[in-house]
Amino acid sequence: MPAHISTQQANIDFFKMTTSQTFTYKVAGVSFCVCFEDYPDGRSMLPSYEPFIVKQTDAPCISTITFAKDAVDINAEGKEIGQFDNAGSNHAVYLLPDGGYKMVIYNYDNEPAVAFISNANFSSVKASLFGNKINRRFGLNNTIMIAYAFSGAYSNILLIHASVTMKDGKGYLFLGKSGTGKSTHSQLWLKHIPETELLNDDNPAIRLINDEVIVYGTPWSGKTPCYKNKQVPIGAFVKLKQYPDNIIRREPPLKAFATLLTSTSSMLWDKPLYDKICNTISAIAMRCSLYHLKCRPDEEAARLSFSNITK
């Protein structure tokens, strides 16, 4: 091989090495690493993660997610588990022979945003991004969130669909289907209940540690930019349902389990993962109160829930 070609290749390899970047983030007491091999603007595409970045940490690393061009394609591979609609974004999921997964995530226009391959417990993920910067950011964020949700499940961490307020050192999580009014109810608390603070408006993390259940802010807060690196013990969960009157009741642990399960990121077909999630939810349901609030979007509903769940 001519010397100038070897030198040129060495320069290319050195450039790749020097442009590779790794950032560590800590959420809910555990860390995850995001490596960018070919995306020099990677960190700038994750502004909501900045409150969670750490230079050094003793927290266990639950996942390493590496983004590189041409590392993963969008072609079907392995056994197709299904095509899943996640709020208008299609997720194609394939089970690989080694027990890992391949996923291809599409944007709301059904254009591919990211393809990634993970091992069975999502502790190692390799991904490639596609499209313009907006599309790449969408794929980047979704990949990290999925990796965190499913690797975190093995550390008794659940990523849950909820809006969370904080009051007097406790966290109150409002649950329900999209459009139920979770964010609206949180805003009613902020308006009518003094010294209430919003922790997260879409995807907080909850964790069982030493017999205590804690809720944490995360980089994932839906349409509301609320990315707080804070944590509080959980005061109560509240399942919301729109109704002409305001009525609240406390649910037994079995109903609490069912409600929490439907609100938690999970994969039914993955038995080890699903069993771990169910065990964590069961332990949480036995330790935390869950209420069912049928309500209007008004001040009375906020005061009713506050007076009952903070007793």
What is each stretch, according to the model?
Residues 2-173, 178, 188-197, 205-311:
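A noncatalytic interaction/capping subdomain that flanks phosphate/NTP-handling catalytic cores
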Residues 185:
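Hydrophobic positions on the alpha1 helix immediately C-terminal to the Walker A/P-loop
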Residues 181:
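Conserved glycine(s) of the Walker
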